[in-house]
Amino acid sequence: MDSNADISARRVSGMDWLWLVCFFHLVTSLEEILLDTTGETSEIGWTSHPPDGWEEVSVRDDKERQIRTFQVCNMDEPGQNNWLRTHFIERRGAHRVHVRLHFSVRDCASMRTVASTCKETFTLYYHQSDVDIASQELPEWHEGPWTKVDTIAADESFSQVDRTGKVVRMNVKVRSFGPLTKHGFYLAFQDSGACMSLVAVQVFFYKCPAVVKGFASFPETFAGGERTSLVESLGTCVANAEEASTTGSSGVRLHCNGEGEWMVATGRCSCKAGYQSVDNEQACQACPIGSFKASVGDDPCLLCPAHSHAPLPLPGSIECVCQSHYYRSASDNSDAPCTGIPSAPRDLSYEIVGSNVLLTWRLPKDLGGRKDVFFNVICKECPTRSAGTCVRCGDNVQFEPRQVGLTESRVQVSNLLARVQYTFEIQAVNLVTELSSEAPQYATINVSTSQSVPSAIPMMHQVSRATSSITLSWPQPDQPNGVILDYQLRYFDKAEDEDNSFTLTSETNMATILNLSPGKIYVFQVRARTAVGYGPYSGKMYFQTLMAGEHSEMAQDRLPLIVGSALGGLAFLVIAAIAILAIIFKSKRRETPYTDRLQQYISTRGLGVKYYIDPSTYEDPNEAIREFAKEIDVSFIKIEEVIGSGEFGEVCFGRLKHPGKREYTVAIKTLKSGYTDEQRREFLSEASIMGQFEHPNVIHLEGVVTKSRPVMIVTEFMENGSLDSFLRQKEGQFSVLQLVGMLRGIAAGMRYLSDMNYVHRDLAARNILVNSNLVCKVSDFGLSRFLEDDASNPTYTGALGCKIPIRWTAPEAVQYRKFTSSSDVWSYGIVMWEVMSYGERPYWDMSNQDVINAIDQDYRLPPPPDCPTVLHLLMLDCWQKDRVQRPKFEQIVSALDKMIRKPSALKATGTGSSRPSQPLLSNSPPDFPSLSNAHEWLDAIKMGRYKENFDQAGLITFDVISRMTLEDLQRIGITLVGHQKKILNSIQLMKVHLNQLEPVEV
């Protein structure tokens, strides 16, 4: 039995009080009365034993009211044992009962004659029973059948009886007992020799009242059977509220303690979206018209933000939709204001420095309500004599810091042609521009460049060498910017300081340098001069004289280059005239779907044009390395960490610091120790390939380390790594326009390689590297081969046993091992699909053989989610079975440029097209091996409604069904175009499955 405390001492603990005050502010507990003799005026009729013990009498209270009480005062004789028993009291569901006693006791000290036998206490008992069994004998009048509650002592006593009969010096005590398990109980009061009066008895139990708090309604709940009991009560969310998703909670609950007080809340309800709290969390009220609440919670409704309104003129809105011409970007919250596209940049101006142009402008007057304004630069070359024939600037034009996504209000444009009229458009865009049907606003300015110095000469070739001389030749500058008057050659011994250099002037693009030392490595640079002055020096090239005693050699296989060099000046004039006539002729031709009146890439295919040279054609592979790759002193390189591994060794991140120049980050491939001569040649072969390329969308070779260990290939460092893994990490974070910009860069790099008669053979997103400015560059030239310059059949036939990346490779390359620039175009289409699907694996989990079979059945990949139709159509063009029908990279670049200029073309999604569509693969085709008949197949593709049509036509076996055509479907009564297409697509997959059951020759 628990200990009892006085009512005056009962207090709520500190934590409970804090909870009550700060969390719920609940009302006080309820008392349910089971028995109350307070103010009783008629006979109560309780049973006493012995009869001369307790007696029921009438007295007056302090308000002069006549009340019935029980009293006993048998102190004269020792051994008193007087019992008073109540009637049977039903507990009415109570688990714990409280008894409040009003009584008075006479002070034993005031009765000296009986002081030794006098008591000032009495004892309270209870006895449980399912039925009323009371009689004069039962329950028995001793402690055995009774349960003691407590011995009650008076706090105050009186010394003499009031002559008026009033009750004096009243005591009030509360005791409790439980848990109760039977239908009812009796109370008994035992006197052992006191002189006292039992004025009133109240029997009650506590209940926690019904309450609505925290948007939940809790019913009236009885207190538990113990003082420390917590009775759980499950609440119900009020109207328009729902249970909050609190971790670990299951339902909304309160707990009723033994004193009838609510405490220990778990879970809670919150107002639904479109509703807010009213009446101190008593109810949820719909948001007024013109306001909204987007999510479940206790937040109030908010007024619709700027440029938005509630979708319906009714209360309870969960969102405010944007007004016409205003939008929210994907990164904006639902309560963010709607914003528009920015106006055009202001005060666009330019400054010309030689053939470079510095463009500056001010922010748009109207930013559309956003801070994320960016700028794109559109460059057009406009011949002065033919208005309206502006074409987009070529890839050689450079933009610093970038062309697209500028955050600065300035850009420097370099590598412009001299004496040419240019038009520059500066577009202002933000994150909602692509959501708008309006074209980006832009400012435009016309710029005419003046005559300029020649551009840098891209490379030099060694024609012959001796012990004391070297003969070199070089092509014309890509941009002569006038008539070349002569060339200046600068050279010095690599072992000496650059300040000790010598110069030589040549009127042709070939020179012989005399008086050199045997066996020495010399550094050469060349520059061209026009009437305006000298252009910049070319990059440094390293050539070595013969050792003493070696025979002079001449590269016979380069004889055409020698002849071409001698005739270079005359050839340039002829080529220029041909190029002008070609441009005029092309401008009059009918526009193709890919050109869009853009400038065509002019390849003279003659003297001075740079070609790719296969390193394997060199008798000495080291000669190719010396010619195409710059040797780097190992002391200039600092390796900081390993970032990967490759076939030949590790890939590292490091820094390169040339004397007198700034340090910059590089990627370093190292050749593992224990390599063979063949492995060394293969490892360095990639460097001799890369060293021939110079394009902003092709990985740049810094140089090689071959004179120390380990052997290294040093390239520029691409911060974001391979394109496929980068896209998977950033899934959904780029706009369609940004993805198209990446694709355009890849296509530009491949156009450059194709123009050099170079076939990549392994073009895939994994072999595209991405830098911090999202510039994509073609890399990994391990599988690449030289493309012979045969216009009728420019192919390379690979070795019969070489490994081929099936998912990226054109069918003719898989079947016949024939690789061409057209097969690279097929691979580029797969790269497009990878980019638009954020790095998803092409053909998903299909086996290589399934891929081969599907392509042979004319199946093609479907558009990735949200892929613009125009991009998927371009992919399908790249996947034409006849390689002659595939577009050239030049046309692909033009098509992507058109999309970038008109972003509205990128908004349409889906596979619809005006031209006949090819069957498209599905990521989840029917599992044909598990299907046994036509009915199961129709159910699998959700076309079960046509079972009867197939049955009546006798179309039962897959072999017969696989030969059905569109006319057959129409004949058996399938007329809905969408259903026809769905069934035909599945029939194509059925064909692939049936073909897999037969041996396939690859």
Swiss-Prot record:
EC? Answer: 2.7.10.1
Q: What is this protein called?
A: Ephrin type-B receptor 5
Natural source organism: Gallus gallus
Q: What tissues contain this protein? A: Most abundant in thymus and detectable in brain, retina, kidney, lung and heart. Not detected in skeletal muscle and liver.
Which is an annotated GO molecular function term of this record?
A: ATP binding
Q: Which SMART domains match?
A: EPH_lbd (SM00615), Ephrin_rec_like (SM01411), FN3 (SM00060), SAM (SM00454), TyrKc (SM00219)
> From what superkingdom does this record's organism come?
Eukaryota
Q: Which InterPro entries does the entry link to?
A: Eph_TM (IPR027936), Ephrin_rcpt_lig-bd_dom (IPR001090), Ephrin_rcpt_TKs (IPR050449), FN3_dom (IPR003961), FN3_sf (IPR036116), Galactose-bd-like_sf (IPR008979), Growth_fac_rcpt_cys_sf (IPR009030), Ig-like_fold (IPR013783)
Q: Which gene encodes it?
A: EPHB5
Compositionally biased, Polar residues: which spans?
910-928
Cellular component terms per the entry's GO annotation: dendrite; plasma membrane
Chief localization: membrane
Region of interest called Disordered, as start-end residue ranges on this chain? 906-928
Write out the annotated subcellular location.
Membrane
Keyword rRNA-binding tagged: no
Where in the numbering of this chain does the Fibronectin type-III domain appear?
A: 344-452, 453-548
* UniProt binding sites for ATP: I643, G644, S645, G646, E647, F648, G649, E650, V651, K669
GO terms for biological process, alphabetical: axon guidance; ephrin receptor signaling pathway
Q: Which residues lie on this side of the membrane: Cytoplasmic?
A: 586-1002
Provide the topology term for how it sits in the membrane: Single-pass type I membrane protein
Q: Which family does it belong to?
A: Belongs to the protein kinase superfamily. Tyr protein kinase family. Ephrin receptor subfamily.
User: Which residue positions does the secretion signal occupy?
Assistant: 1-29
Q: Active site located where?
A: D762
Where the record annotates domain SAM, the positions are 929-993
**Residue pairs linked by disulfide bridges in the UniProt entry:** none
